[in-house]
Amino acid sequence: MVVVSLETGARVEGKWRPSSDTDTHAALYNAFPTLGGIVHTHSRWATAFAQAGRGIPAMGTTQADYFYGEIPCTRPMTPAEIGGSYERETGNVIIGTFRERRIDPAQVPGALVHSHGPFAWGTGPLDAVHNAVVLEEAAFMDWHALALEPRKGPMQQELLNKHYLRKHGPGAYYGQG
């Protein structure tokens, strides 16, 4: 583990070099102040959706328990973004996607970067890892559901509301927390 300054990216504590994705993380932390941990993976199924340029639709209750809707995929990055401050711009395309689509990052704790892979976040590092695992499982299940029924759309809104809000809404009653 290495502690870095969100303003400068400089190492504050620890013996390791900061991740090459530090600027992506800093952009997300600065734009979304409720984030307490971020995880970036290249997990197989979620990355397949990212490479296809597709979000992960909310097709089932496993996803609905943690993500209040589709896990979005960003637009492709421009040549200028790729050739410039690539890592910072990676964060910016995620931020832009959430702002343009009016998605609350606390309600949808993850995104796919087009042609790249998933980023997930949470209230802390363990929550971010957990959300990354759920994101990958949702991608796995959706891929298989779409293989079985290519015309399958998202789950009905009422079921999404029930599963998400019983854990995260006012008067939440599901679980031990």
Language-model segments: which ranges?
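Glycine-rich flexible loops
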Residues: 1-177
